[in-house]
């Protein structure tokens, strides 16, 4: 009987250690106070550098920040050098990594696919890179934003 109890205790202890290790390895280092720096309305301007060049402009709204998790919506128009123009909009979700670094993914409809963004937030400015991870031909390029007052 004590052998079964010892095995159960050992199994519970291993699960607790594994969960603690996983949580500590995956948790961003941002404090909850600094996480709110990304919340709000932003302009969004990007360049598509591959496979077809183009420009992307519109808005990014970060509407919910729960310590390190963020959510919002992106609404943009992409204009390619081929003359094709398309409006894309969809939900945004991501993580505040530290006091100035954010990572978020925009799930854009109308063939925009999923676009991963990595950016620095400095005051009322946002700048970084994006890459298309699903959807049409893979695209990538720089982007920036300004907080709207």
Regions found by a protein language model. Name each.
Residues 1-24:
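Sec-dependent bacterial lipoprotein signal peptides
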Residues 19-41, 149:
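Bacterial Sec-dependent N-terminal signal peptides
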Residues 27-29, 56-57, 112-115:
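Charged, amphipathic alpha-helical segments
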Residues 31, 59-60, 85-100, 123-149:
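Edge beta-strand at a domain terminus
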Residues 34-56, 70, 74, 126-130, ...:
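Tryptophan-anchored aromatic micro-motifs
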Residues 48-50, 73-82, 87, 108-113, ...:
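Short, solvent-exposed aromatic-acidic interface loops
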Residues 52-97:
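N-terminal glycine/threonine-rich, aromatic-flanked beta-hairpin/loop signature
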Residues 88, 92, 100-118:
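An anionic, turn-rich surface loop/hairpin at beta-sheet edges
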């Amino acid at each position: 009987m004590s052998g079964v109890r010892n095995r159960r205790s050992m199994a519970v202890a291993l699960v607790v250690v594994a969960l603690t290790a996983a949580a500590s390895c995956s948790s961003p280092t941002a404090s909850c106070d600094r996480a709110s720096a990304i919340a709000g309305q932003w302009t969004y301007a990007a360049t598509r550098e591959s496979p077809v060049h183009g420009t992307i402009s519109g808005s990014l709204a970060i509407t919910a920040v729960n310590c390190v998790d963020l959510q919002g919506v992106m609404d943009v128009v992409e204009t390619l050098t081929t003359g094709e123009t398309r409006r894309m909009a969809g939900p945004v979700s991501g993580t505040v990594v530290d006091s100035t670094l954010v990572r978020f993914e925009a799930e854009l409809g109308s063939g925009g696919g999923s676009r991963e963004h990595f950016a620095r937030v400095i005051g009322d400015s946002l700048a970084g890179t994006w890459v298309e991870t699903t959807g049409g031909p893979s695209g990538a390029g720089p982007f920036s934003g300004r907080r709207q007052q």
